[in-house]
């Protein structure tokens, strides 16, 4: 009992009272960031741990680091998953650099996304892979175990956090990021989508993962090759404001005299 307790037994209660004195404002213990020259130089040098394997990107940005939020935006069927499969699985990509990568798929079937990763790693079509499995194994097997795919259909960002906390990937791909929103995949509320982006960014910082957040662009981006962050579906500036890097992907419109078979 604290009523007749001695100094030792009263200490827990005394700490509580001291922390909540002055109109119950708690005293907060904080840790200061090391702002020494050596630490800031070391931190700056590690900002590009995961290098881009696309030369034009590498020349502009070099790469990204754990704890960052990287947004990829495009219209449907323009190439979001093909783009991140290239960054992750193609030669000299993040898997080849040693990253442990987790792909959370809530749009396409995970097997379809995994097939894109396999073709990116091998440089072969599915037909070519079927005809020459030995070559496919030689090219794909060295990185296969570094990349894991999970069906995340109907899951929330809270669920994604639990998975990331448990499995501790270096890189996690949210495909599609906005569909992890707590209010459901169909929400167009900018405040909800911004909160979802903040949550994704915080997950990356808390667990030391680079978060790749794929998102759809609105109908305003249809047929255009010059894109802007204002074209992100439902998000306005919230998602852009949270991102460390955003890349929007466009597809050149077909020429007037092209046929359906033209690329």
Can you say where each PLM-predicted feature lies in the sequence?
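Short, small/acidic-rich helices and loops at N termini and domain boundaries
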Residues: 1-34
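The Walker A/P-loop phosphate-binding site
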Residues: 24-123
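Amphipathic alpha-helical transducer elements in NTP-driven molecular machines
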Residues: 51-54, 111, 136, 157, ...
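Cytosolic-facing regulatory segments adjacent to core modules
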Residues: 59, 95-168, 182
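Short, well-ordered alpha-helix to beta-strand connector turns
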Residues: 67, 169, 243-244
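Structural motif
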Residues: 71, 171-175, 212
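Phosphate-binding/switch region of NTP-binding enzymes
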Residues: 73, 77, 196-263
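Phosphate-binding/switch loop-helix module in NTP-utilizing enzymes
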Residues: 148-206
């Amino acid at each position: 009992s604290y009523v007749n307790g001695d100094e030792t037994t009263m200490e827990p209660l005394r700490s509580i009272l001291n922390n909540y004195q002055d109109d119950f404002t708690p005293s907060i213990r904080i840790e200061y960031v090391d702002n020494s020259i050596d630490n800031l130089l070391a931190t700056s040098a590690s900002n590009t741990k995961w290098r881009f394997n696309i030369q034009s990107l590498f020349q502009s940005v070099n790469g990204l680091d754990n704890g960052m939020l990287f947004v990829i935006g495009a219209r449907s069927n323009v190439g979001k998953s093909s783009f991140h499969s290239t960054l992750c699985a193609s030669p000299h990509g993040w898997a080849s650099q040693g990253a442990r990568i987790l792909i959370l798929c809530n749009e396409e079937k995970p097997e379809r996304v995994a097939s894109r990763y396999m073709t990116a790693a091998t440089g072969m079509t599915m037909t070519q892979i079927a005809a020459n499995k030995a070559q496919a194994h030689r090219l794909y097997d060295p990185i296969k175990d570094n990349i894991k795919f999970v069906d995340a259909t109907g899951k929330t960002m809270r669920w994604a956090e639990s998975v990331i906390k448990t499995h501790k990937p270096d890189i996690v791909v949210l495909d599609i990021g906005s569909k992890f929103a707590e209010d459901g995949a169909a929400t167009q509320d900018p405040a909800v989508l911004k909160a979802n982006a903040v949550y994704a960014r915080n997950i990356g910082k808390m667990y030391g993962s680079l978060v790749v957040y794929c998102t759809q662009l609105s109908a305003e981006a249809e047929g255009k090759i010059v894109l802007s962050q204002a074209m992100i579906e439902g998000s306005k500036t919230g998602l852009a404001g949270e991102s460390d890097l955003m890349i929007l992907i466009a597809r050149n419109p077909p020429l007037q005299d092209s046929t359906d078979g033209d690329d």
